[in-house]
From Swiss-Prot:
Keyword Manganese in record: yes
Statement: the UniProt record of this protein carries the keyword Endoplasmic reticulum: no
Function: Involved in the biosynthesis of polyamines which are thought to support the growth of thermophilic microorganisms under high-temperature conditions. It seems that long-chain and branched-chain of polyamines effectively stabilize DNA and RNA, respectively. Catalyzes the decarboxylation of N1-(3-aminopropyl)agmatine to yield spermidine and urea. Does not act on agmatine.
A GO biological process held by the record: putrescine biosynthetic process from arginine, via agmatine
Native source species: Thermus thermophilus (strain ATCC BAA-163 / DSM 7039 / HB27)
Catalytic activity: N(1)-(3-aminopropyl)agmatine + H2O = urea + spermidine
Family: Belongs to the arginase family.
Marked site (Important for catalytic activity) residue numbers: H144
Reported cofactor(s): Mn(2+)
Protein name: N(1)-aminopropylagmatine ureohydrolase
Keywords, sorted A to Z: Hydrolase, Manganese, Metal-binding, Polyamine biosynthesis, Spermidine biosynthesis
Record's signal peptide: none
Residues annotated to bind Mn(2+) 1: H105, D128, D132, D210
Length: 293
């Protein structure tokens, strides 16, 4: 049985938003299980309240369709990434706004490539505990530790928020390539520098969010948890500012590794649903029923 997001699954022809499960985790280097993340988020989404009090609207009313999971080939990273890119392109060319659910973070590379081919140029907002700027990891350029190195070399402007693990070479590369870096420790000491983040981004933005950006006390179900992460409120405030000021062309949410802690899956589903609502308000697909709550 095909899983859906939330209580209502819009017919594909009527949907504005397509949720694309990408259950690929061939490149994980620590705890396994991210391939089960998309299914866990879809199952948890059944329990969400359709009306979001904070938004004053019900995001499901934009029309959300959950697509079939993208197939992948065990042991064949390059071929699997090609399949991800082609599946994303299919939905983008049909005029859908895409929210992809990983899977490990390597899936971001083919997803971003598909968005560029279909929609043109944009900047990247990468929210994560890890910089993911290794040229390769464990002998593979398709590692979940490498997607943003590859995207940097392909010319994408990059803004990274919430980072708390980064090696010397990655830091040197980030400085050389003009990456705008907003590490978690600075955010905790000084507050979320929204004006600086918005200034560093272009007019059009693709957002990639690794759930380990959140503190493990809130989000324990990730492959590589690190203390000192962002709060749910900080992440929501960041997303709200970006959606308010920029055109968000697409998103992915990655690296949920379900481990029996349902509150983490609910948190992930709620964050995805909130982001869909923000896009609905930005694009004029939704209107606030109630203001100033």
């Amino acid at each position: 049985m095909r899983l859906v997001f939330g209580e209502k699954d819009a017919p594909y022809e009527e949907a504005r938003v397509v949720v694309l499960p990408v259950p690929y985790d061939l490149s994980l280097s620590f705890l396994p299980g991210a391939r089960r993340g998309p299914e866990a988020i879809l199952l948890a989404s059944r329990e969400l309240e359709p009306f979001l009090l904070e938004l004053g609207a019900a995001p499901e009313e934009v029309g959300i369709h959950a697509a079939e999971p993208v197939p992948w080939v065990a042991g064949m990273a390059e071929e699997s990434h090609r399949l991800i890119r082609e599946e994303a392109l299919k939905h983008l060319r049909a005029g859908k706004w895409l929210v992809a659910l990983g899977g490990d973070h390597s899936v971001t590379h083919p997803l971003v490539q598909a968005h560029r081919e279909a929609l043109g140029e944009f900047s990247l907002l990468h929210v994560d505990a890890h910089a993911d700027l290794y040229p390769e990891w464990q002998g593979s350029v398709y590692s979940h530790a490498s997607p943003f190195y590859r995207l940097l070399t392909e010319g994408f402007p990059l803004v990274q928020v919430g980072i708390r693990a980064m090696d010397r070479d990655s830091l040197r590369l980030a400085r050389k390539r003009g990456v705008a870096l907003f590490p978690a420790h600075r955010i905790h000491r000084e507050g979320l520098p929204l004006d600086e983040i918005l200034e560093a981004l272009g007019k059009r933005v693709y957002i990639s969010l690794d759930f380990d950006a959140l503190d493990p006390s809130l989000m324990p179900s990730v492959g590589t948890p690190l203390p000192g992460g962002l709060s749910y409120r900080q992440v929501v405030d960041l997303l709200e500012a970006v959606f308010r000021e920029k055109e968000v062309v697409g998103m992915d949410f990655v690296e949920l590794s379900p481990n029996g802690q349902f509150h983490a899956e609910m948190t992930a589903a709620q964050l995805v649903y909130h982001a869909i609502g923000l896009k609905g308000l930005q694009a004029g697909w939704l209107s606030r029923e109630v203001d100033h709550i």
